[in-house]
């Protein structure tokens, strides 16, 4: 959530510098000038159809839609070229300018054709690696299954390293609320693909409210607080199966789980200070308790990346397994847990956790308030500029 807000704020800011920052690719469109021209009504219907898409078409397609819309309604690009650090507006300008002198009628037709090609996404589902049994419906970013007394919530954006976008935040909350009431005995979170989760998705910057950056920061803080609260209040045993690298909030939340099992190829990284931010997920409280204040400081403030073995030695991870046998060993154990008396598990968790719950909610509220201020700071924006410039040189 923090990363997504920062990406948007960075994109809105023009910083005079010689740094080269990654931006969206210039859109290349193949136009058919002899195609039948779409009517104005067809054009308007297509604009409405875009709002009904259930699956995010991706940034490149969004830029194409933007460019074609501008070309169809205003003609060739007539805006001055934005500065190099005004990432979003520069990407929009590049996309629109690439259309050259394409007639409005042709742009309108291409807009209609593009939207028509996207229509299958109204019914498409998220991609799942072969062998994954999808038994849930209604989720675009998750695979949720319930079998053998286990509800499994799998992050399902493997091509994006399971980065958490706004839709996934809401879907995880919905899945947790459903799992708290279903017949399963335990609930497991894991990732599809090579990553457990790479943390927040930096492309969460398009839904900007009329109130601008201040309202965006406030809304994100409210969402983050509610999201973390779902983990604090979850009544059943909650287990993380960390199948690969974990970054940011996917790490900080682990202090709220009842058990954490990791592959030996997993790593744990919280680069908050590098991005001018502060801890989240109650980690400012749970991590010092779990691993000592000194070790928590090394990770949360100085951004040390832990191996699975180091995370286990410091108490963040329950047990580490060889990657070659990880899935088999862990799921054998989880199936055994799911055969234990369910009421005993819930009651025992309540006894262990209830004294901390009020404190955790207070910590969560404080962390979100602090982050709201950090997201609005120049220091935070500058840190993200430096991060993106380094990334572009890799």
Curated annotation (Swiss-Prot):
PROSITE patterns membership: ACB_1, ACB_2
UniProt source species: Homo sapiens (Human)
Gene from which this protein is expressed: ECI2
Highest taxon of source: Eukaryota
Biological pathway: Lipid metabolism; fatty acid beta-oxidation
Listed name of the protein: Enoyl-CoA delta isomerase 2
UniProt tissue specificity: Abundant in heart, skeletal muscle and liver. Expressed in CD34(+) T-cells and CD34(+) bone marrow cells.
Family to which this protein belongs: In the C-terminal section; belongs to the enoyl-CoA hydratase/isomerase family.
Residues the record marks as site: Important for catalytic activity: 280
Binding site for substrate: 198-202
